[in-house]
Amino acid sequence: MHKGKKNYPNLITSFRMNLKKIILNHDRFSHPERWKTNALLRFTFVYIKFLFDLMIIKNPLRMVGKTNRDAVTALNSLQSNYANIMAIRQTGDRKNTMTLLEMHEWSRRIGYSASDFNKLNIVHITGTKGKGSTAAFTSSILGQYKEQLPRIGLYTSPHLKSVRERIRINGEPISEEKFAKYFFEVWDRLDSTTSSLDKFPHMIPGSKPGYFKFLTLLSFHTFIQEDCKSCVYEVGVGGELDSTNIIEKPIVCGVTLLGIDHTFMLGDTIEEIAWNKGGIFKSGAPAFTVEKQPPQGLTILKERAEERKTTLTEVPPFKQLENVKLGIAGEFQKSNASLAVMLASEILHTSNILEEKIKCSSNASIPEKFIIGLQNTKWEGRCQVLEKGKNVWYIDGAHTKDSMVAASTWFRDMVRLSKRKKILLFNQQSRDANALVNNLYSSVSPEITFDDVIFTTNVTWKSGSYSADLVSMNTSQEDVEKLKVQESLVKNWNKIDDNRAKTHVTASIEEANELIETLYDEPADIFVTGSLHLVGGLLVVFDRIDVK
């Protein structure tokens, strides 16, 4: 950029984010009913918005183009920052009960009603562990029936390397061109329409839904425009109040293994979490879940199914899959694959592609196309093995106790006979990182001992910058810059490991990778786990190295 030239789009984006922060932190905006009672406050903000509209700030991206990069920049401006998240948590208000009403309103403003989404023949999947893998398995199975279902949509979160991964057609992320095209169609429709401030007082002109809500809207728009015949939707968080729950008539619903996660939003107990997950159940849409759910959670799921006038069936691991090499590694994936078989069976039968549904029995016969779909499933960052030069990388994102135990057990079983050096690369910036490390350590010990342990941030590059698609505003920037979490992890590791491993701290993923390459001349097995932002950032670093 030339010296003295103003970067107006970035300045405007920064202003809009700070304005949003003021609104969210203001007591009246936190409670819409109070906003309604203060006409002066309403007038002030509407007038401010009018002035900025005159300055062509309503949509600054119109001035600089509508590329994929512009779309990602605009999308990142919709993230809630760390201060806002902490402020909301301090109020103790777990639920945004307006979410679904808002989603209906945002949908109206981009030209759709919820009933329009029924034509997508949706599989709706929730759960704590494995819902993304189950969604990928289901999509891959359906993809084997291309003649009858030429276009299959898949909506998942989070992404690893590129936000486009969240919106896939036939297993592949949509292109940069299509992402930008559909993104700005939604963005511009929202800019050109308004909502009633009496019904939606916080939807001031020019405002947008949050990051995940916007992407959910974008996914519906994309799949309808691309004429997808069936779509698989993974819930973002929970189910009852998740933005994907605007889906009124799914064909079938699935629930993967339940566990404790997102407690601020969903509750502290399995019962509360199960209640939220069961919120996706709909009348007339059968629901399936994996075997060996926590008993208390299963009881609540059954109650929710009865309440919603549908059935809930437990799916046993199919014996026919015992010797099948699934596209996603890990013994625990057999349960997810079995659930995917039942979900796909329901869609294919409803679409008159399968004459008979697959029986929900461990001895059931599974069609060859289903097996091929499970074998061909690709899902980066989950039990992934990569050979890079002399080293072998074992990569599996894990951010809950159960997923960390599963990931660590997978790594232990994969390398227990290996004589190579063992290196751990870990970060988890926003959850109880030390507790996860303790779960990891107890899962691999005493069979596996690490020679070196590296704790890094999720910052992508040595320069201190992030890959654009990996920008995250929901963690404390001060903690990242001061390496507070990483230093705490070092102390904890040295304590539980009795100072046997060499511990290291790096300020970026790129630095961590360079450190690993210089630690030993001999080959090493490297376990990368924790945050999916770490996993995605590492894969981005690998991509740049491969290009060079």
Curated annotation (Swiss-Prot):
Pathway: Cofactor biosynthesis; tetrahydrofolylpolyglutamate biosynthesis. ATP binds at G130, K131, G132, S133, R382, D396. GO terms for cellular component: cytosol; mitochondrial inner membrane; mitochondrial matrix. Mg(2+) 2 binds at H262. A monovalent cation. It catalyses: (6S)-5,6,7,8-tetrahydrofolyl-(gamma-L-Glu)(n) + L-glutamate + ATP = (6S)-5,6,7,8-tetrahydrofolyl-(gamma-L-Glu)(n+1) + ADP + phosphate + H(+). One of its GO terms (molecular function) is metal ion binding. Its EC number is 6.3.2.17. It is found in: Mitochondrion inner membrane; Mitochondrion matrix; Cytoplasm. GO terms for biological process: one-carbon metabolic process. Keywords: ATP-binding, Cytoplasm, Ligase, Magnesium, Membrane, Metal-binding, Mitochondrion, Mitochondrion inner membrane, Nucleotide-binding, One-carbon metabolism. The keyword Cytoplasm applies. Its main location: mitochondrion. It is an enzyme of class 6 (ligase). Mg(2+) 1 binds at S157, E234. InterPro entries: Folylpolyglutamate_synth, Folylpolyglutamate_synth_CS, Folylpolyglutamate_synth_euk, Mur-like_cat_sf, Mur_ligase_C_dom_sf. Its cofactor is a monovalent cation. It comes from the Eukaryota. Catalyzes conversion of folates to polyglutamate derivatives allowing concentration of folate compounds in the cell and the intracellular retention of these cofactors, which are important substrates for most of the folate-dependent enzymes that are involved in one-carbon transfer reactions involved in purine, pyrimidine and amino acid synthesis. Required for methionine synthesis and maintenance of intact mitochondrial DNA. Involved in telomere maintenance. Belongs to the folylpolyglutamate synthase family. NCBIfam families: folC (TIGR01499). This is Folylpolyglutamate synthase. It comes from Saccharomyces cerevisiae (strain AWRI1631) (Baker's yeast).
